Curated annotation (Swiss-Prot):
One of the GO biological process terms: translation
Recorded superkingdom: Eukaryota
Protein source organism: Tetrahymena thermophila
Name of the protein described by the UniProt record: Large ribosomal subunit protein eL27
Recorded GO MF terms: structural constituent of ribosome
Gene Ontology terms: cellular component: cytoplasm; ribonucleoprotein complex; ribosome
Primary location: cytoplasm
Subcellular localization(s) per the UniProt record: Cytoplasm
InterPro entries, alphabetized: Ribosomal_eL27, Ribosomal_eL27_KOW, Ribosomal_eL27_sf, Translation_prot_SH3-like_sf
Similarity annotation: Belongs to the eukaryotic ribosomal protein eL27 family.
Record keywords: Cytoplasm, Ribonucleoprotein, Ribosomal protein
Amino acid sequence: MAKFLKYGRVVILLQGRFAGKKAVIVKSSEDGTKDRKFGHVLVAGVERSPKKVTKRMGSKKIQKRTSVKPFIKYVNLNHIMPTRYSVKELCDFKELVKEDKIKNNAKSEVRDTLKKVFVEKYRTINPEEKSASHTKFFFSKLRF
């Protein structure tokens, strides 16, 4: 059977604190590892998505409303739902989110760098690009 939970795939988390939030697969381990003996993925996602901005808003308000709060988490394969979207071009997640950094309690530093990258990418979405709809979907709030 083909593996479809690959790097860059957008997934929706189904269980836990971040249930209903969108995330991107950074690393997939379908057979498990020594630490986690079950199939799991390392995801980087958006905990708080940016809000709508209008022309009448000032620059400070726009800065505040376009902020993104990211998260990093290991998730069991049973607790994710893959989508048809893929955002490999968003940034190089493998360089930003490394497992040794997460294990060495540098998770907050990784989260800060992710926040900077996510905010910068969100503010510079080009609607003419082919992958713009994928990026727009990733940063939008899931309505249900």
